[in-house]
From Swiss-Prot:
Transmembrane segments: none annotated. This is Holliday junction branch migration ATPase PINA. Residues 2-106 form the PINc domain. Residues 493-505 are annotated as: Required for maximum interaction with Hjc and Hjm. GO terms for molecular function: ATP binding; DNA binding; four-way junction helicase activity; hydrolase activity. The C-terminus (residues 434-505) forms a novel KH fold; this domain binds ssDNA but is not sufficient on its own to interact with Hjm. It is probably destabilized in the homohexamer. It catalyses: ATP + H2O = ADP + phosphate + H(+). The lineage of its organism: Archaea, Thermoproteota, Thermoprotei, Sulfolobales, Sulfolobaceae. Changing residue 325 to A: Loss of ATPase activity. Ca(2+) stimulates ATPase activity more than Mn(2+) or Mg(2+). Disruption phenotype: Essential, it cannot be deleted.
Length: 505
């Protein structure tokens, strides 16, 4: 009887099924170095190692049942990778390596080692039985009933799929099945593996697996796009279509989670491709379903600097940046936009103004219109608001005196052409102010506020009955010091005005 040396890829491929069905036969060997590697990885919280160790236990049970040997072999004191030590052992003892790894197969060919390359078994995925045409996502967690989110973006409900809670072994079995299927289904890959979590793109499914200690139990979330739209399906305003074709190069697609931002970004990327533009994407994970003409880059497999260099050298007309979350993401968007690359960013936000706030805190006001020119807000799968940004020099709405003119970014509703918000620097703070609720303040009030607010931030200034009244909160009266009194007296004398102090209740 042959001796079969299993590698990690065989364990993750579900080799126990092949043994149980009689597709491969022989004594089962596992090298000590592989067990040591799996132990280290499991202690580091890697889900794949946990799944591989579960498979080892399953193999031990099956070999006892079908009466073949199960043996841990080799010398774990030798230094080297588990695959390398397994090959050395097989060369010495004449064993057959069982693998599902193309690289391992090529090395065995080169070294003249016998191998058995596992071919996929024709079988479906058990979790697919939970999906129907309306299912957006499946939520499985140990000791709870499986649930599904059904409907469409912005109009969905949670549905229990069973009355019986799933056991930890059931959840782990589904996780095992998913990891095994990564090598079988075209377009599948492990996107990220961290301590306690695993993110997989499995064909059309995006899978997130978590385990203790990261989560309080084994949990699997599987999402699937319910709708795939073309840009024409959104029935967009002709003015927006024209802007997207001719002017928009700093685009932000904003919306709450699950509202259809990525679906719209996907439709826009395909639209630009049909216009003959070169389009690339940056994703984490890569879950957009796009034609092969559009290259999709993963943020998890490259440093931000590397992506920056690649995108500048490959000269795309547009780059779609899905899921912008942290400072690095926004910095890359800004750098590429200022370098002349058309950018489409996807941002979580509860309103279009919240999306602009994310940039206001990171860049100078003067560069905002060069970075952003079009904000598209998605709600319930549809475009609900479009803003454009333009820079001008004017007195902000609500300020009265002509010498308060300053650079102002106007945020206009594309549909009406009306300015709804203004961005400008007030004192030392960059503010986004609704035009219909602007700050009403004269030049003198502004000067007094600037002096007082440096020392008493919560104080307010108003003009009434021929006097300028400074209203100070009672708890901050201690900050009203001699230096401030002297400055206000000088201002009174110089401008022939009267300033009065009043405590707020």
């Amino acid at each position: 009887m042959n001796d079969l040396m299993l590698d990690k890829s065989a364990l993750l491929f579900g080799v126990s099924k092949y043994l149980e069905k009689g597709i491969i036969t022989g004594n089962v060997l596992i090298h000590k170095s592989l067990l040591a590697e799996l132990e280290r990885e499991s202690n580091d919280g890697l889900v794949s190692a946990e799944i591989a160790l579960d498979e080892v236990k399953k193999l031990k049970d099956i070999t006892e049942r079908i009466l073949v040997n199960f043996e841990i072999v080799g010398d774990d004191s030798k230094k080297g990778e588990a695959n390398e030590l397994s090959r050395e052992y097989c060369l010495e003892k004449g064993c057959i390596i069982v693998t599902a790894d193309e690289t391992q197969k090529k090395i065995c060919d080169a070294m003249g080692i016998q191998y058995n390359f596992l071919q996929p078994l024709k079988q479906g995925l058990s979790f697919e039985s939970f999906f129907d045409d309306e299912t957006m996502s499946l939520h499985i967690k140990e000791d709870t009933v499986p649930r599904a989110k059904k409907g469409k973006p912005g109009n969905w409900k949670f549905v229990n799929l069973s009355d019986k809670p799933m056991l930890s072994t059931d959840v782990r079995m589904i996780a095992n099945e998913i990891i095994n299927a990564v090598r079988l289904i075209k377009g599948s890959f492990v996107e990220i593996e961290r301590r306690g979590s695993l993110i997989i793109q499995l064909g059309n499914y995006r899978v997130v697996i978590t385990r203790p200690p990261l989560s309080d139990g084994w949990e699997i979330t599987i999402t699937r796009p319910v709708v795939r739209k073309r840009l024409e399906d959104y029935n967009l305003d002709e003015r927006l279509i024209k802007r997207l074709e001719e002017r928009a190069e700093g685009i932000i697609i904003a919306g709450a989670p699950g509202m259809g931002k990525t679906t719209f970004a996907q439709a826009l990327a395909e639209y630009y491709m049909r216009l003959g533009k070169i389009v690339k994407t940056i994703e984490s994970p890569r879950d957009m379903h796009l034609p092969p003409e559009i290259t999709q880059y993963s943020k998890n497999y490259a440093e931000i600097g590397e992506l920056h260099d690649i995108l500048l050298l490959s000269r795309p007309d547009y780059t779609v940046y899905d899921e912008m979350r942290n400072d690095e993401d926004f910095k890359l968007y800004v750098d590429l936009r200022l370098a002349g690359v058309g950018m489409v960013g996807v941002v979580h936000a509860t309103s279009p103004i919240d999306a602009i706030h994310r940039f206001v805190n990171r860049v100078d006001i003067g560069t905002i219109p060069n970075i952003l020119d079009t904000i598209i807000f998605i709600n319930s799968g549809n475009v609900s608001k479009v803003y454009t940004l333009e820079m001008t020099v004017k007195v902000p709405a609500g300020l009265k005196e002509a010498d308060l003119a300053r650079p102002v970014v106007e945020i206009k509703d594309l549909a009406t052409g009306n300015t709804e918000y203004e961005i400008y620097v007030f004192g030392e703070q960059t503010m986004i102010v609704p035009v219909n609720r602007g700050i009403t303040m004269s030049n003198m009030e502004f000067k007094i506020s600037k002096i007082v607010n440096n020392i008493i931030p919560n104080a307010t200034v108003k003009y009434e009955d021929g006097e300028y009244v400074i209203v100070i909160p009672k708890e901050e009266i201690g900050k009203y010091n001699r230096k401030l009194v002297q400055r206000l007296k000088r201002l009174e004398k110089k401008n022939n005005i009267k300033i009065k102090i009043k405590l707020s209740d």
